[in-house]
Amino acid sequence: MNKDNSKIYLLVLLGLLTAFGPFVTDMYLPTLPAMTDFFHTSSSMVQMGLTTSMIGLAAGQLLFGPLSDKYGRRTPLLTAMWLFIGSTLLCIFASDIRQFVTARFLQGIAGSGGIVISRSVATDRFGGRDLARMLALIGAVNGVAPVVAPIIGGTLTDSIGWQGIFCILLMLGCVLLAGCFRLRESLPAERRSAVAWGDIFRSFGTVLRNRRYVAYVLQMGFAQGVLFAYIASSPFIMQGHYGFSAFEFSICFAVNAVAIGSAAAFSIRFRNPERSTRAGCMGMLLFAAAEAVTLGLGCGFWVYEGLLFGLLFAMGLTFTSSTALAMGAAREYAGTASAMLGAICFSFGGIVSPLVGIGDTLLSTGAVFIVCALCSWLSLRIAPRHTAFAAA
């Protein structure tokens, strides 16, 4: 490791870069109802800003991953940071919802660069137990982001408005850009990929022909659909239907983030990843059905919140184990498999997000919960049994 880049420096910088996803998606959630009034549009159109950012986060991973392998880590990362700053300025000064939605797509692409390249830098700089330790610490920093981001947004929404939230994101982008200028190149020229772009795309096809990999990626994708249906609908349900303030909503959002994180930690208590994944999928299906009935009947908040906490906990059981199962199935193409896994999951989130804004939000959300949970469970049916995990 270069002497100019200490472990503490790398931990903070890479941790914040990997947290781009939650900051880009979660921080402005409490402002969605206010943005509906500001742009004089529907909730579904405002949620398109979430959709396009998810699509950008998905597509950008497929772009920045190969770019960083061919041209090094530093230049693509600096490019992503400049793009993030520019797209955030476009969000702030958007005069109509179409401009805002377009800017959010660019912001998602820029954020994906930080997510993908930060993992690559850690792999370049460290090896063995040091790499495992660094990735665990980065994961801890990243795990705090979904809790902190909506609280910051909810606390400041009433005082600075939605443009103020994006001004904070702009300042974060400037700080990270300054930090990236200090980052030394971690991939020397002699280690960079020399393969043609056609070979890279052919490796995507090879991975997609792996039935076991596809099964677990689909399972994760539909589980992400449940997650982003919740993310897109919760501001309107909690603030619009139940009458919560932006700050009260952010506290509930943070509590629900704990459900996902604690489930991921609890999943290691299962005997193998397959059991954790199957238990989580069955739990998702049961809680999704109960939550749909609750939303349809218009039950009280605590019934809604209790079932939602259970739904998110069940979903969290699948995340870590499904990732391990998918990556284990495509070990020979780990880089490609990782990029595609992230891209497909964010794509599912982007597709699902606007669906909860069609018609009655309560009924639409319940329907999306059931369909995604059912498809997540059915996806496991196409996965062939694997001897490494099939033991009781």
Question: Predicted segment positions?
Answer:
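Juxtamembrane intracellular "pre-TM" segments in multi-pass secondary transporters
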Residues: 2-3, 185-216
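Helix-breaking motifs and short loop linkers at transmembrane-helix boundaries and internal kinks
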Residues: 40, 72, 93-99, 110, ...
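Conserved MFS/SLC helix-loop-helix module at the cytosolic interface between two early adjacent transmembrane helices
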Residues: 59-98
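Paired small-residue
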Residues: 83-90, 98-106, 302-308
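Helix-loop-helix hairpin linking two adjacent transmembrane segments in secondary transporters
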Residues: 99, 129, 136-181
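Cytoplasmic helix-loop-helix junction between adjacent transmembrane helices
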Residues: 103-144
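C-terminal transmembrane helical hairpin of 12-TM major facilitator-type secondary transporters
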Residues: 277-321
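A late C-terminal transmembrane helix in Major Facilitator Superfamily
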Residues: 325-361, 368-369
